[in-house]
């Protein structure tokens, strides 16, 4: 269901649209699927989505005055509740034509996610995931945000375990 929401928003991304408009379109789509936006009013958060543009890291509040422009990159963090279960996923998109450097950032970031997923197998340790992400990203010279981490999800939006995207010295729990 969340992928349907992401696809709807991806199709709407264009120069001239505001992040507020994307938020309202996404909320309408979530509700049309019989779901509830799980970010809206979460710890006082005033929107259904976190929509960050360019160098904003995450959790930016949609705004009528924040207009997307050709060459921007926009990250949409979306979540919904369906039959008491939460989902949460972020996607980053190009707004029109972007620079090769911006495209490389999107590509490396996306692939780092899949490198981590490859390590999420029985017998490995939790932080094998973290280290795989760091191993992939570091040679490209990109920094990794250490204040935010991946997390479990289910009956609550944020559940254990926490999964850092940066290198860990310890192994973590066995999967």
Protein language model regions, located:
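Active-site neighborhoods and metal-handling regions in enzymes and metal-associated proteins
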Residues: 1-175
